[in-house]
Amino acid sequence: MKFVVDTHTHTIASGHAYSTVQEMAKEASANGIEMFAITDHGPAMKGAPYLYHFGNLRVIPEVLYGVRILKGVEANIIDYSGGLDMPEEYLRRLDFVLASFHDICIEPKTLEEHTEAVINVLKNPYVDAIAHPGNPQFPLDIEKVVRAAKENGKFIELNNHSFVTRKGSEENCKEFARECKKQGVRIVCGSDSHISFEVGRFDRVYKLLEEVDMPCELVMNTSVEKFDEYIKRKKERIRRK
């Protein structure tokens, strides 16, 4: 299984990442990545860009160094009804939207409250995937979350960075992978790179996918064409709203 798409990356705009879009694209090209999503943190994160940054992403070329660039965000879940820190008028302009919990944006509560919030987020028509759902600070009912992803046509992310920065994530990620395989839910894999040298790095995720024997057809990162088709359908759906 070869990955050619990276769905989770951060540029210097996130405030705690260290590379420009141009540097990220150049490194992606060198690493054999054909498409990546810029998913800088939403404005509730300390040091993250304001909304105008996301409104102006259109100035970034669609292709740099032969690599396709998706304009996106990692939106923060900011309440337990599933509210995000990005208003609809901005979300609807983006190609790819991740949503996630961060403890500096929302205080962890109970498994039931976390699960309800994520299920509500998955109902948001602009959200494409739940990022790093294996985070042990925010335990989830894995079966219910995966079922909600299936019902809403959304993705579950496996995050390569989680194995290092979110200690205790590995077993949760493995359970998410197993449940996605069981329910036939598609996954996206993100490097969560905060510097250009990590774009397209999936070593830990590769190992996990091998362990659970994940079918290739459930992994979106193997084909630019799969992503193009998904984004085309998403934009058509949003236009009809």
From Swiss-Prot:
EC number: 3.1.3.-
Family as reported in the entry's similarity comment: Belongs to the PHP family.
Annotated residues for binding of Zn(2+) 3: E74, H102, H132
Name used for this protein in its record: Probable phosphatase Cthe_0111
Record's cofactor remark: Binds 3 Zn(2+) ions per subunit.
Binding-site residues for Zn(2+) 1, renumbered to this chain: H8, H10, E74, D192
Keyword list, A-Z: Hydrolase, Metal-binding, Zinc
CDD domains: PHP_HisPPase_Ycdx_like
InterPro entries given in the database record: Phosphatase_YcdX_put, PHP_dom, PHP_phosphatase, Pol/His_phosphatase_N, Pol/histidinol_Pase-like
Gene Ontology MF terms in the entry: phosphatase activity; zinc ion binding
GO CC terms, sorted: cytosol
Cofactor requirements of the protein: Zn(2+)
Binding sites annotated in the UniProt record for Zn(2+) 2: H16, H41, H194
